Structures are given as C-alpha cells and as structure tokens.
C-alpha cells in the first residue's frame, strides 16, 4: 500500500482518446468544436494499491496463423535461425508482454505434449480444428519464445488427458532427475525449463473434471509446492461450480475466466461503434460476479481469504471465426466443404474490422482489471497475434492494430500503484442501453509524486473537457500526454496505411 505525500501535484500523466504518458487519452475524434465535460477526483485519503503487471499478458493457440505464419515461420526471410519472426518479436517487445498462455484453448483438448519434443516429431491430426498439426512448435519453442520476450511461460494441460500425462509434462519441464528429466536432457536441454504456472484443462466442467483438477493439483504441488495452479472456473455466461472450491480449492492459486463480448464463432458480425461501446462496462460486472463467487467460498471457509486470484486468461472484444468447428472426430481434409469452412476463418484477419472500438474497449477492460486488482492478477488477451489480436502478421511484415497501441501505452506509461477515483460525467446512450462517456484510471509511482492517468472518451463525435482534482484541489504543475484517436470511429490500420491510428504527443 502507498499513501500519498503532501507534494503530490508536481506531475501528471494524461491519456486522452487512446493515449498515455502523463495523461493517456483514448478518444474517437478530436476534430469537433463541441465537447462533453467530466470531473475526475482522486481520493487522496485512501491508499493506492499495487497491481500485478501480468494483467497485460497474452495468449497463443494453435489456430489459424497465430503460431505458424505468426510468431513462428521458419521459411520466412524475416525469421531468425530458430524460425521466429524478428519483426513480430520486436513489436511484441514494445508491449513488454509479461506472460503468455499456451497451447490453448480448445486445441489443447487433443494435444499431447510428447508429440512436440525431440528430433523425431511427426504431424498429428488436430481434430478440434480440422487441420494437420506439424508439431514443429512445441514445448521448447514456446520456452524460447518466452525468453525472447522476457515473458513468464504459462502452460495449459490437456484437460481430457490422464493426470499422469500432466505430471509427466511438469517433470519433463522442471525436474532435475528422473525419466522425463533424462528425456529433456537427451533432447538437448540439460537445465530445467522452470515453468511455474500450469492450468488443468481449458473450459472444462463437471464433477469428473473437478476431481481431476484436485488430483492433478495435489500431484503438481507434491513435485513443487511453489507451482501455481489454475483451472477452468467460468467461461461465457456460466458460473463457478461450488464443488470446485469444496473438492479442489486447497490446491488452486487461480480461477480461470474467459469471455468474448462479440461472439463470432459461427456467424461473423461487425457491430457498429455505439454497439461496441455499450459492451464496454460489461467486463467490470463480469469481474465483480467472479469476485463475489470467490468471496462466498472464502466466507464458507472452503478457501483461505486471498488465496485464489482471477486469471482472466482469455478475453477480447471479438472472438475469432470458426464456422462448423470445433469438432470431435477427424475430418476429410480433401472435402471441399471442409476446405471452405477453414478458409472462412481468415475473415478474422481483415484489417478494417479492428477500429477505435477495439482500442477503447481494450482500455476499458484493462481499467476494470486495474480497479479490481486485489483479485484480478492475470489477464491474457486472446490471441496476441493474428485472428482478432492486437498484432497482424502477414508474409511481408506486420500491422499494429488499434488495440496494439492501447497496450503499448498502458505498459509503458502507467505507474505501479492504482488509486481510487470518482468520475462525474454524462452518459452515452444507444436505444435503451447506456454507459458513462468517460472511463479513467489513475496510477502513481512509488514516491507518490508522479501520476499517470488514463482517460477514455467513448463519445463518437464530441471532444472531452475534463477536470482532474486531488481531493478539493485541481491538479496542476508539469504534465505531458499522448492521445490515441482517429479521423472517425471506423479508423483502422492496414498494410498501406499502418499509422492511421497511432499515439501522438499532446
């Protein structure tokens, strides 16, 4: 906890539209003389709380062009000697990605880790997504990627596999001695990989699964009590099964939460800007719901207070498109209908989809995590690369989508403590729905002198006039700022115009 000293008015960071530094401002348009007004008041008598930077994490699944043709492309002239796209690595390093969850996702339900290690790898059928998995990107390639990004590796087990297969993977990754440690050494990696965070399955439920979580968690903790264990907790509009806390709670460090607010799985849609903004406060209510369920388990004594945190390890405004899938049996790869369905997935790569809606929604999501940082200690945008992710990768280069810049601003400009604030302003309406025009987060450094404030202006056509106060006093002194905005709500970046939407100094 950090208390504010009396000389707190020296510096200010502002974020307007979509920008951060002294002020980070995220906004739709700045070419309008009309404005809306708001007042942000920092509660100077309350403590500022440290947040976990793992909320700026990412997720990669063996789907589409996230791995192959994304971060990993050995045949490309843009790749290094190990097959990693250097332009992608450089861009992701701008985001200081703190943690990456891998290999899925639904893909993991059919993944057996042993197929992705060693020199004798063979392609296997990816039944879930109806393609052939080459297995050239496996455990060691994932660890290498994490090293290139200085990111914490977070591995998700096959939730349909036997517990022993999970334990074998942990031993292969982390053990000093034993059968699987010896296998790792034979494969050319004498030192343990030191993977500390493991998830027991992806989006599984039911008593049989929960019992597996209990058994796997118990066995993993026996290997190393410092391992952090998570499992499927809540996805979509489901709720956490109370039996999970009762049966497996003592072995858990995280509950996994997943949500995509525009579900494009089967039918693809591109709602307009206002429709997207009407969704921008839903992450907060979703997070509060999960917190309340955890608190109920704490009150009942099923888990210790503060023991289990939330890993929001799949989230995005938009889900990616996969009509006709996922499946549970091998498909005929030569079937024209199957080929057509798989090709249809590429609509998620269309640059024009990712406009200011994605940038501002992402800022609102991150603000929700920051405001609830006592419980939300990890979040992973899904995916990090291609499909609906912030970085588009094509054979000749990359495009930083609008929400790439949201992440870049937040990770580089925010300070390390979150303050409690009050926001007074008007509402933005769309039919019967409404949200606040302004969303904001205020952060402060360890000294208590330097502030960084992110301000999101959701209004599609009006500028924002915003007062920032510390208690009863207006903040003053030196400040700098960056703004992320565009010519219109539909502004986007593409190959020909990669900087239509990019932060600007103000």
What do these predicted ranges mean?
Residues 251-254, 262, 273-281:
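Active-site cores of enzymes that catalyze phosphoryl transfer or operate on phosphate-rich substrates
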Residues 1-35:
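Bacterial Sec-dependent N-terminal signal peptides
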Residues 28-240, 245-257, 283-284, 288-321, ...:
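Non-catalytic accessory regions flanking glycosidase/transglycosidase catalytic cores in CAZymes
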Residues 259-275, 325-327:
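Active-site His/acidic residue clusters
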